[in-house]
């Protein structure tokens, strides 16, 4: 991570050099060469017919991998050809983990040729047959007319193909919701998930709060989860037409799980825990149009950058401001996104066509940052955000998912509950492997460094029963009569074959983002590594006596309370007051349970 990311934390790091990223990316449809990643500055001369002189627009050449397929036309294929097309569709769906995009009327090299109306109708009919064959559904995203070198109107059509994998109940995407206090995070989620607009006084957010003081103050202090479903046709499924979460899950082919995080600075540790432990696919950064970048906005942006979580931005409360105020806030965001240490390309979304393009480019390039402007009271532009979320594909590919599933089981314990007639229940994310009902696992480390045997009695995802949990999925696991007092946040449940190692001392390569004076041996910080959150003391700074803001070094930390389960390469974030730093674990000094007991005074 570039040390200049510290500027986004509100620190006083010396600014680095380097040019800012270019202008705001204008979201354009498939019919525009500049908006689709085609060659810039290279144009072929088109023929002049009927007074038209059009240049051939291009998409990037078709890639063998990925979930995007180009087809010039699909008119009356032979049976052999049809079977080949079906096999090809299965491959694209597998690459997109259940979603694929077909561009009809496009050559393999990306040239937008287009089809006449009859050919397009026949091609879509064939595509529908292919989808039926594999058990998928298709939705036409958009159509574009291209008239290059032709007197007859010709169109290209972009089609979304969606199929829930056989081993899953629905496609799942986790979105962390960030933003300053009072920016409207919980209100927006209430509007999306309840299906009713806000009254301007926070009515929509009431169902999301978990504590009385949250209802009284209107401010989130804990992590809550809300779900928004989409059926196979891309239609919203929420509590407006479903009474329970189970009904939403049953009716949805794609599920968006929103992780609502706290905006107030006093709850920053909770927000960091939500980002590091719940492994969101991406983040939604909410910015109030009337206040702009204020409070913790810049710090939350810096957290997303430091943890390499892709994010998009929603400018809320546009009903309270003049148009010029909204434009000023957008320009302010664009300047921050382009500055050194961020290097993002803003993409302002103002139409449904823009939303489709933004979803695709956001998935393909980590530098693209879509910006939406909307109101939770009037509902203006709310549909554009829904279109974006419906089309947004999983940001990890099938190969990465398959590799994780081949590893031994590892489940992060993030939440612990006691449920009547069920017993002890833990919530968290499966980092690797596969977990099934009845599996025998070990959980730890305990305060004395031990791992204890347990059995997974049942599994639930989004409040619906589930027999098998796969890597990357979040769920709750019932552990029966296992003693809750033996569990704590930060533990892991792993396969006994893993022979897990624990440590009290570890080393990490860090960048000190901000510190008021000098960072020295003996300084205490709160360390966040995945679902681990514990105070640690700096034992040694290699090759240096002290660190200043913006400097990098390898540092040895020691946990103060109890040993933890860490892995080399894990991302690390530490803070104490205004002191902040990021890095990754480079070495762990493994110890036995006996050594842990001796170190901790047992």
UniProtKB/Swiss-Prot annotation:
Induction: Up-regulated by IFNG/IFN-gamma in human monocytic cell line THP-1.
Annotated spans, Disordered: 16-64
The entry's keywords: Disease variant, GTP-binding, Intellectual disability, Nucleotide-binding
Alphabetized PROSITE patterns for the sequence: G_TR_2 (PS51722)
UniProt-reported outcome of changing residue 319 to N: In JABELS; uncertain significance
Disease tied to this protein: Jaberi-Elahi syndrome: An autosomal recessive disorder characterized by developmental delay and intellectual disability. Additional variable features include ataxic gait and abnormal movements, visual impairment, microcephaly, abnormal foot or hand posturing, kyphoscoliosis, dysmorphic facial features or seizures. Brain imaging typically shows cerebellar atrophy and hypoplasia of the corpus callosum.
Name of the protein: GTP-binding protein 2
Encoding gene (name): GTPBP2
């Amino acid at each position: 991570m570039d040390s200049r990311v510290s500027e986004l934390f509100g620190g006083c790091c010396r600014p680095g050099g380097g040019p800012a990223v270019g202008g705001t990316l204008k979201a354009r449809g498939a019919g525009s060469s500049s908006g689709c990643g085609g060659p810039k500055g290279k144009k072929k001369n088109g023929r002049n017919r009927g007074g038209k002189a059009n240049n051939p627009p291009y998409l990037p050449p078709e890639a063998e991998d990925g979930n995007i397929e180009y087809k010039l036309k699909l008119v009356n294929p032979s049976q052999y050809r049809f079977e080949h097309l079906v096999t090809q569709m299965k491959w694209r769906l597998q690459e997109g983990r259940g979603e694929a995009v077909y561009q009809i009327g496009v050559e393999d090299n990306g040239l937008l040729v287009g089809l006449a109306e009859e050919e397009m109708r026949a091609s879509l009919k064939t595509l529908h047959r292919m989808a039926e064959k594999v058990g998928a559904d298709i939705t036409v995203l958009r159509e574009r007319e291209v008239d290059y070198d032709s007197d007859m109107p010709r169109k290209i059509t972009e089609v979304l193909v969606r199929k829930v994998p056989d081993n899953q109940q629905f496609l799942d995407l986790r979105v962390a919701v960030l933003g300053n206090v009072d920016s409207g995070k919980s209100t927006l989620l209430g509007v999306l998930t309840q299906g009713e607009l806000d009254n301007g006084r926070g009515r929509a957010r009431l169902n999301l709060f978990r504590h009385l003081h949250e209802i009284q103050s209107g401010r989130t202090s804990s992590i809550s989860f809300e779900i928004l479903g989409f059926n196979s046709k891309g239609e919203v499924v929420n509590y407006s037409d479903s009474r329970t979460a189970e009904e939403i899950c049953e009716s949805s082919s794609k599920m968006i799980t929103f992780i609502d995080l706290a905006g107030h600075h006093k709850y920053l540790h909770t927000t960091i825990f939500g980002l590091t432990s719940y492994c969101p696919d991406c983040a939604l950064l909410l910015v109030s149009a009337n206040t702009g970048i204020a409070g913790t906005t810049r710090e939350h942006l810096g957290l997303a950058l430091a943890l390499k979580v892709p994010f998009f931005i929603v400018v809320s409360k546009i009903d309270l401001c003049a148009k010029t105020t909204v434009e000023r806030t957008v320009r302010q965001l664009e300047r921050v996104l382009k500055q050194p240490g961020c290097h993002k390309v803003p993409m302002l979304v103002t139409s449904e066509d823009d939303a489709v393009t933004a979803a695709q480019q956001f998935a393909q390039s980590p530098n693209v940052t879509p910006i939406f402007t909307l109101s939770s009271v009037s509902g203006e532009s709310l549909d554009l955000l829904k279109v974006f979320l419906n089309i947004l594909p999983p940001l990890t590919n099938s190969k990465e998912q398959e590799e994780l599933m081949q590893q031994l089981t590892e489940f992060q314990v993030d939440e612990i509950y006691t449920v009547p007639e069920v017993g002890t229940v833990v919530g968290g994310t499966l980092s690797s492997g596969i977990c099934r009902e009845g599996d025998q696992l070990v959980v730890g480390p305990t305060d004395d460094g031990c791992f204890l045997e347990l059995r997974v009695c049942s599994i639930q995802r989004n409040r619906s029963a589930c027999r098998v949990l796969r890597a990357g999925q979040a769920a709750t696991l019932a552990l029966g009569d296992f003693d809750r007092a033996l569990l704590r946040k930060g533990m892991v449940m792993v396969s006994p074959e893993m022979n897990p190692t624990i440590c009290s001392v570890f080393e990490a390569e860090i960048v000190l983002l901000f510190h008021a004076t000098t960072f020295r041996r003996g300084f205490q910080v709160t360390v966040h590594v995945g679902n681990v959150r514990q105070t640690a003391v700096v034992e040694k700074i290699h090759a240096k006596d002290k660190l200043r803001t913006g400097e990098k070094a390898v540092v040895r930390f020691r946990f103060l309370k109890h040993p933890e389960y860490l892995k080399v390469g894990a991302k690390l974030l530490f803070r104490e007051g205004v002191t902040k730093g990021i890095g990754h674990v480079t070495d762990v000094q493994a110890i036995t349970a006996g050594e842990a007991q001796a170190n901790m005074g047992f």
